[in-house]
Amino acid sequence: MVNIRPDEISNIIRKQIEQYNQEVKVINIGTVLQVGDGIARIYGLDKVMAGELVEFEDGTVGIALNLESDNVGVVLMGDGLSIQEGSSVEATGKIAQIPVSDAYLGRVVNALAQPIDGKGQIPAYEFRLIESPAPGIISRRSVYEPMQTGLIAIDSMIPIGRGQRELIIGDRQTGKTAVATDTILNQKGQNVICVYVAIGQKASSVAQVVNTFEERGALEYTIVVAETADSPATLQYLAPYTGAALAEYFMYRKQHTLIIYDDLSKQAQAYRQMSLLLRRPPGREAYPGDVFYLHSRLLERAAKLSSQLGEGSMTALPIVETQAGDVSAYIPTNVISITDGQIFLSADLFNAGIRPAINVGISVSRVGSAAQIKAMKQVAGKLKLELAQFAELEAFAQFASDLDKATQNQLARGQRLRELLKQSQSAPLAVEEQVATIYTGVNGYLDVLEVEQVKKFLVQLREYLITNKPQFVEIIRSTKVFTEQAEIILKEAIKEHTEFFLLQEQK
């Protein structure tokens, strides 16, 4: 008979009790009632929060947006074609966030920050919420440093500062994207991180922009976030927030960033589609009531941080498309009221060959001259006034046949100044070249030339200055002031080059 040892048995039982570890796992699950058009209605999910991510059986992720008494309205981040009625859905307990790191520079990603350029995974160990709160009043300081765009018309008359939000608005095919991409090209060597967000664009257009950045060496300091026209509405709606989160990562690390949203009209349309499918009540132009908040919470994230937070900045250039120049439509008026000014691009000017087609009369920068270097203020002060007077005179001159000499001179000067503002695409100018160009026009040195000769003359003058008078460039760069010495050097250069140019043209 086997001996039973009670102490041994009790030891074994005690050990088993000590090792016993019961885990209580609570999972918040629901059932799909209906799915279609990028929207799913879920029964259950009682404890789900607004904006929480939910996961379907097939791995598709969605965002819970509508919390109703008997069901939850979820927008899908994918096509949702393999989701079936009756399948289960699990709440994740997380809200949308993306990985962030320096390795994102030079890459093209989607709205979930996943690479779509075929260059492999992006290493990242830090996460940021896609929707993070904007900096408060105490965290900010007023804008005081210039963000040079490389376009004479903007840098002289509608200056943009670091931390500002300046809207680019105009009809389709007026060069809105060109203004934005030129600004990115001009940040080369300026220690500015750029983020270009393409929302609902044609894939070919995005590829063209990326190609331009690559050719011009701008991709190394740029991140492209792209959700093309065939992407689900949810991802088009999220893309700008993803771009802002990537830019914020650098802003809070004491760096200057520039973000371009191309364009917010498409984001508003994607949001309208989601809202209508979720059966939210439509408002003006069928947009939901909170479409203003959609854009305001995005654009308020652009800021110039205070010295306690490291003086980083995020400058936003949102783009909005108008229909037949109607600036009083719903989305344009909303975004105009949120931003610190707007650059208005006119189809008439574009078709008349004035490019960039900036309508200087109704474009404004509400930060203004705080965002200009002193040298630019000194030479460009008279430019806007002269152009405004010229526009008025030009309209008047169409009816009057015999004009006095002074009026004829003013018209001639205006035509040359307008010519001076024309620039080729992807050819941004350094600020010292702009100062020299404007000084030449405003002080009447172009009056001796024919209007057709102005562009050629200015291109050659800028080359002449850089090669023969490098001290001029050095003075403007180092002092940021248009000193007497700089003026003497510039006058000399203009005089020498004008003589040479006129001789050359006579041949």
Curated annotation (Swiss-Prot):
Its EC number is 7.1.2.2. The keyword Nucleotide-binding applies. One of its GO terms (molecular function) is ADP binding. Its main location: plastid. SUPFAM superfamilies: C-terminal domain of alpha and beta subunits of F1 ATP synthase (SSF47917), N-terminal domain of alpha and beta subunits of F1 ATP synthase (SSF50615), P-loop containing nucleoside triphosphate hydrolases (SSF52540). It is found in: Plastid, Chloroplast thylakoid membrane. It catalyses: ATP + H2O + 4 H(+)(in) = ADP + phosphate + 5 H(+)(out). The keyword Transport applies. It is a peripheral membrane protein. Signal peptide: none annotated. It is an enzyme of class 7 (translocase). The record marks S363 as: Required for activity. Keywords: ATP synthesis, ATP-binding, CF(1), Chloroplast, Hydrogen ion transport, Ion transport, Membrane, Nucleotide-binding, Plastid, Thylakoid, Translocase, Transport. InterPro entries: ATP_synth_asu-like_sf, ATP_synth_asu_C, ATP_synth_asu_C_sf, ATP_synth_F1_a_nt-bd_dom, ATP_synth_F1_asu, ATPase_a/bsu_AS, ATPase_F1/V1/A1_a/bsu_N, ATPase_F1/V1/A1_a/bsu_N_sf. Coiled coil: none annotated. PROSITE patterns: ATPASE_ALPHA_BETA. One of its GO terms (cellular component) is chloroplast thylakoid membrane. ATP binds at G170, D171, R172, Q173, T174, G175, K176, T177. Produces ATP from ADP in the presence of a proton gradient across the membrane. The alpha chain is a regulatory subunit. PANTHER family: ATP SYNTHASE SUBUNIT ALPHA, MITOCHONDRIAL. NCBIfam families: atpA, PRK13343.1. Belongs to the ATPase alpha/beta chains family. F-type ATPases have 2 components, CF(1) - the catalytic core - and CF(0) - the membrane proton channel. CF(1) has five subunits: alpha(3), beta(3), gamma(1), delta(1), epsilon(1). CF(0) has four main subunits: a, b, b' and c. This is ATP synthase subunit alpha, chloroplastic. It comes from Anthoceros angustus (Hornwort).
